[in-house]
């Protein structure tokens, strides 16, 4: 995020945004932050929403105040907001397609998920499970939540790995899984 926005500001594609907040995936805190940004008079708010519906009231208030709201990854369902989303389920499924090409005999798979309860985590995991259903030579032997953080993922994997049968592959939701197994 920092690299891309920094380059975009230097090229004049976007103006510099002096405010950056994090709510640690807490809906009430995120809603309060949106309301503070409204009061501060920002022209736009870009948000990775902690909940698809839980922020709609605050987002609607921002839109009503003439603020452009853009949600990405964790998107909001409020119609006034712009939504930038990818096919997260497809992202999960394509991992298993790749494994099927690389490991045609299949085997046990360890799934390292993201942050529990977040739409993106659920969608990617759903895609992984759909991929395993399509490629029946694979079986998910275990699943842990790595919270999209390498240290958390490594600790979670260390806790479950000794109890699993031989694992042939690891599927993840991002770089958090590197070096985890």
Give the residues covered by each predicted segment.
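A residue-level marker of the well-folded mature domains of exported/periplasmic proteins
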Residues: 1-181
């Amino acid at each position: 995020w920092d690299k891309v926005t920094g380059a975009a500001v230097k090229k004049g594609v976007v103006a510099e945004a002096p405010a950056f907040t994090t709510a640690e995936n807490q809906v009430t805190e995120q809603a309060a932050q949106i309301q503070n940004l409204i009061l501060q008079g920002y022209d736009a708010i870009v948000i990775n929403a902690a909940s698809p519906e839980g922020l709609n009231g605050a987002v609607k208030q921002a839109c009503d105040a003439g603020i452009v709201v853009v949600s990405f990854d964790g998107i909001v369902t409020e119609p006034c907001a712009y939504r930038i989303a990818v096919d997260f389920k497809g992202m999960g499924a394509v991992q298993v397609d790749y494994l099927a090409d690389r490991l045609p005999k299949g085997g046990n798979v360890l799934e390292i998920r993201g942050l529990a309860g977040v739409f993106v985590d659920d969608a990617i995991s759903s895609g992984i499970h759909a991929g395993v259903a399509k490629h029946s030579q694979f079986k998910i032997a275990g699943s842990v939540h790595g919270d999209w953080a390498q240290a958390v993922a490594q600790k979670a994997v260390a806790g479950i790995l000794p109890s699993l049968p031989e694992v042939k592959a690891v599927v993840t939701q991002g770089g958090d899984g590197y070096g985890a197994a």
